Amino acid sequence: MDEMATTQISKDELDELKEAFAKVDLNSNGYICDYELHELFKEANMPLPGYKVREIIQKLMLDGDRNKDGKISFNEFVYIFQEVKSSDIAKTFRKAINRKEGICALGGTSELSSEGTQHSYSEEEKYAFVNWINKALENDPDCRHVIPMNPNTDDLFKAVGDGIVLCKMINLSVPDTIDERAINKKKLTPFIIQENLNLALNSASAIGCHVVNIGAEDLRAGKPHLVLGLLWQIIKIGLFADIELSRNEALAALLRDGETLEELMKLSPEELLLRWANFHLENSGWQKINNFSADIKDSKAYFHLLNQIAPKGQKEGEPRIDINMSGFNETDDLKRAESMLQQADKLGCRQFVTPADVVSGNPKLNLAFVANLFNKYPALTKPENQDIDWTLLEGETREERTFRNWMNSLGVNPHVNHLYADLQDALVILQLYERIKVPVDWSKVNKPPYPKLGANMKKLENCNYAVELGKHPAKFSLVGIGGQDLNDGNPTLTLAVVWQLMRRYTLNVLEDLGEGQKANDDIIVNWVNRTLSEAGKSTSIQSFKDKTISSSLAVVDLIDAIQPGCINYDLVKSGNLTEDDKHNNAKYAVSMARRIGARVYALPEDLVEVKPKMVMTVFACLMGRGMKRV
């Protein structure tokens, strides 16, 4: 640690600062950027107006970012606490950090990671996730060796060690992500366990989990903060899957007067859940809530919500469930919360929170509790009479979903829920430029919260800068694309930019492995064919448009060439293939590619339909994995 940070600081204080730093550093990259500061103030529920938060963050960056690289390192963080301690700004900052609750340092002596951040984990989360997983996998014969787990011990951290539970949870969140035939379930040697963990991590990445800083060895060792972080992402993706208008048209009942369907579609799942809870609270005559933390601590809003959504027995075959409101008047908060959870239990929804989690206002677990309520009992009716353009609700294409998952897996902030709406201020695109080694001058970038007046102008300036970077340092082909197109959310032109980002990212990985040799389509095709023929395989490909790719045989053979003997050819169909055969081959190929360690984002359908862009990424990822053999 350098001079500037060592002025009179005790070991205890240093440990506390490390823990605080880890709480703010959301993507665990060892630095705090202004997005993470915004998230911190948002989560801390501090009663500050937007402009005040902007001022505080600007001042923190000004005083704290001493080497002016646009982010705060751990040493700079210590400096803020040491030197700027007395200022109001630093006091507010400390207060915000202290409000992120529920932290339990590991046995008092936390492990320090290479970045010097302290890792702590939340007992409450462990307890909640264990109960959720026990219920989800109670009838799965492949998990009998670990389920049920005891929520009061460290069972969970041991249970994830062979990768099976993780693979199963991924499939529950996004069905069919992993081909069950690719999960090793017997004779679990260290090598076979490593493969399962590769499969789990690469599949988690493909559904949009941020796993950049998690390795298979971390999961095998059951590192609590990493296990809980990954599980929360997987569980959340499953909980949020249907909180989306194209998958759940009844959500249109939440439209407010004068609001268009397009505006409603831009809301994140969290915002929709809040809107849903308030819709029912309004109908019950109770006041609105603004969050799932401070505003639900007394359980009173929950009582009303349960009472509204409980089935009234009016539909055929639907038993009536009565919510007993007597606990509402209980004077003790914890007892009131317990009484409320007993009512939730009648609906089969006593999940994720204990009475203490409700009373402490744990934001993550309360969000999960409400999402589960929504999934079981939405209690919404699709509006029939209104003038609604239902054609807008087409849902995202496979390609859009793949791009979105790829971005989220790289840990962009904010999380991308809607490809076009969430890129309209270009912040995510600018972060992706950094991931492909195109330097971004963050002092030129406008950041949220944007001022009420002129917000769109600020976003447009970012979009113009994003297009400028694409044309010059990145040398993308952006003919006819302007910042306005990104700002308007023009699908075709936004996709053109995003595809070039993903392509460059994929090729960079290859160039890093090949000591900087340029990679392009021809080089990949030649490598694929050479590798296949050297392994004595009869398949080959002409290009990424080659129709024979639809059988997936070239992909399967290439995987077997890279890791000889890993493919079970009894499971692979050849000859005259039906659509089903092709799909089964593709599903097996994608899962096996992930199992041998290739981070494949494409979907089986991309191979069956021979989508050249996605086919290119599959072969490029496999080439990357093949080059690591040397």
Swiss-Prot record:
Q: Name one GO molecular function term.
A: actin filament binding
Q: Supply the name of the protein.
A: Plastin-3
Predominant location? cytoplasm
Task: List the residue ranges of the region (Actin-binding 2).
Answer: 383-627
What the protein does comes down to:
Actin-bundling protein.
Annotated positions binding Ca(2+) 2: 65, 67, 69, 71, 76
Fetch the SUPFAM superfamilies from UniProt. Calponin-homology domain, CH-domain, EF-hand
Q: Which SMART domains match?
A: CH, EFh
Q: Where in the cell is it found?
A: Cytoplasm
Residues bearing Phosphoserine? 268, 293, 326, 339
CDD domains the record matches: CH_PLS3_rpt2, CH_PLS3_rpt3, CH_PLS3_rpt4, CH_PLS_rpt1, EFh
What quaternary arrangement does the UniProt entry report? Answer: Monomer.
Modified residue annotations for Phosphothreonine: 391
Q: Do the record's keywords include Phosphoprotein?
A: yes
Supply the source organism for this entry.
Answer: Cricetulus griseus (Chinese hamster)
